[in-house]
Structures are given as C-alpha cells and as structure tokens.
Amino acid sequence: MSFFDWLFRKKPKQNIPQMPSWESIVEMMRYKHLDAFADEVVNVIYSQDCSMRYVILKGENGLFTYQLEAIYQYDEDEWKYICSHDNALPAMWEPFRGIVGKSVFENTNDLLKELKSEPEYKQYF
C-alpha cells in the first residue's frame, strides 16, 4: 500500500449503538460518577423519578455541603463521538441549572433542614 493510499483510504464505518430509552439511561446513571467529587460523599438523595439527586459532601475541614445534580443526556452528535470510547455512558450528571455554590453546615441536621426548604426539593423529591 502506498503512502497516499494509506493516507486517503476510507475509514471503516463504525457501528453506533442506538441511544437507550430515557428510563434505561436513568437506571444506568444511578450511583454513577460519585467518585468524581474531591470531598467525601456522605449521602445521596434521589428524586422520585431518579433523574436528579442531592449529593451531600463532607469536606476535609469537617463541614458539610450539598450539590443538586441532574442527568444530562447527550445529543446524537455527542453520542456518535462518545461511542468510540470504552465504557461510554449515554449521559452524565451535571449541576442542576449550573448552580454549584451552596452553603456550608456544621452538621447534617442543619443541612437537611435547609435542603428540604429548597423549591427544587419540594417539587422533585
């Protein structure tokens, strides 16, 4: 094979698996990516349909905080690209509406009281 043949040869078509249903994605994503946090994960509270979660974290200083996350499903183009990687998931957890900063608490009781007063908690949990 000459250099130009090798350079301009067509790449074989890659079989792209079909995007799973939303219910399958939600089930797949449960308990995933909890190791991505720098702080210790103390508890995880899932919404009624399990598409959202509150992750309660404990920092090195002993203080607690939480983060609300929602499942982001990749679109078709993203899925085509991601499928080329091993162990690819069709979605990822991301901070809900991009909100990352939360208050810091000395104990989990105060944290849970604050968490339960949030409108997202009242609506989805």
Model regions and ranges:
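Intrinsically disordered, low-complexity regions enriched in Ser/Pro/Gly/Gln/His and often acidic
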Residues: 15, 72-73, 83-87
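Surface-exposed beta-strand edges and their flanking turn/coil or helix-capping segments
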Residues: 69-70, 79-82, 120
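Low-complexity intrinsically disordered segments
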Residues: 114-125
